[in-house]
């Protein structure tokens, strides 16, 4: 199982004090030496963490492939084409969101996506679509002739957290998931099944399958066991653990959990 380490949250720490430390660039060699196969960053329209100069330096200096997450905003796509990351993962964006809340609306943006994908391909950039695990969306993604899809695991992660962590007893409790344990277990089972079904369909259609969002040290093994998924992109939980263990050990710990024996 390949691991892409999202280093956005190093920039989040920097931006919390509006200074130049910590520098996300310093994470590159640690990620490689610790066994990561990819660096993932998100160049948001609002530049809330990673900035243009960060993205440029990371892409130029990383010895690992860089997966650049971005919206389909034309100005952002122009920047991505100049930066030339190994891969661009197209994601939805909402300025008011804390983090990405769901997958792309493929059906509603099909024509615009086709133009964006064609432009990225013309610049020799591999393309992935960040999507919800639904069969119709998988099939539309295939029509768009992308190389990858990344399945949004946020719903799965939220259900898992409400069931097996103390999230429900905190001020971050997810109101719509304040259900009985039996109801949450049923929802979790259905969520995993849908991810499995979508992964199988995508693989059958010739798409490479990644997954990410909300994955952590507690829930990741349920996703890493799905054989059709080749890659996981994980950020916040790794950076959070690194505060206590150091980044190298945090990555090693995650690699150990997701390895395929």
From Swiss-Prot:
Keywords, in A-Z order: Cytoplasm, Pyridoxine biosynthesis, Transferase
EC number: 2.6.99.2
Residues reported in the UniProt entry to bind 3-amino-2-oxopropyl phosphate: 6, 17, 214, 235-236
Family under the similarity heading: Belongs to the PNP synthase family.
UniProt-listed GO biological process terms: pyridoxine biosynthetic process
Gene it is expressed from: pdxJ
Species this chain originates from: Aliarcobacter butzleri (strain RM4018) (Arcobacter butzleri)
Record-linked InterPro entries: Aldolase_TIM, PyrdxlP_synth_PdxJ, Pyridoxine-5'_phos_synth
The protein's name in its UniProt record: Pyridoxine 5'-phosphate synthase
Subcellular location, record wording: Cytoplasm
Catalytic reaction(s) noted: 3-amino-2-oxopropyl phosphate + 1-deoxy-D-xylulose 5-phosphate = pyridoxine 5'-phosphate + phosphate + 2 H2O + H(+)
Residue sites binding 1-deoxy-D-xylulose 5-phosphate per the record: 8-9, 44, 49, 99
Quaternary context: Homooctamer; tetramer of dimers.
């Amino acid at each position: 199982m390949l691991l892409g380490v999202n280093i956005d949250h190093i920039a989040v720490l920097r931006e919390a004090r509006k200074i130049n430390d910590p520098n996300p660039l310093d994470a590159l060699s640690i990620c490689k030496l610790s066994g990561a196969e990819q660096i993932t960053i998100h160049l948001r329209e609002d530049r809330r963490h990673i900035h243009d100069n960060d993205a440029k330096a990371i892409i130029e200096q990383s010895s690992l492939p860089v997966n650049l997450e971005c919206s389909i905003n034309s100005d952002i796509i122009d920047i991505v084409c100049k930066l030339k990351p190994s891969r661009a993962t197209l994601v939805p964006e909402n300025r008011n969101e804390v983090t990405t809340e769901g997958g792309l609306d493929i059906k509603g943006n099909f024509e615009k996506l086709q133009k964006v994908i064609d432009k990225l391909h013309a610049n020799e950039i591999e393309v992935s679509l960040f999507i919800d695990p639904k069969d119709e969306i998988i099939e539309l993604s295939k029509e768009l002739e992308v190389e990858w899809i990344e399945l949004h695991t946020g719903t799965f992660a939220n259900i898992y957290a409400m069931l097996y962590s103390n999230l429900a007893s905190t001020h971050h409790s997810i109101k719509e998931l304040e259900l009985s344990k039996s109801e949450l277990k049923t929802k979790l089972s259905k969520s995993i099944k849908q991810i499995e079904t979508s992964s199988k369909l995508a693989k059958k259609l010739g798409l490479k399958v990644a997954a990410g969002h909300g994955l952590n040290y507690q829930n990741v093994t349920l996703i890493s066991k799905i054989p059709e998924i080749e890659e996981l992109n994980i950020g916040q939980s790794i950076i959070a653990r690194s505060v206590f263990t150091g980044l190298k050990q945090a990555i090693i710990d995650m690699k150990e959990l997701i390895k395929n024996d």
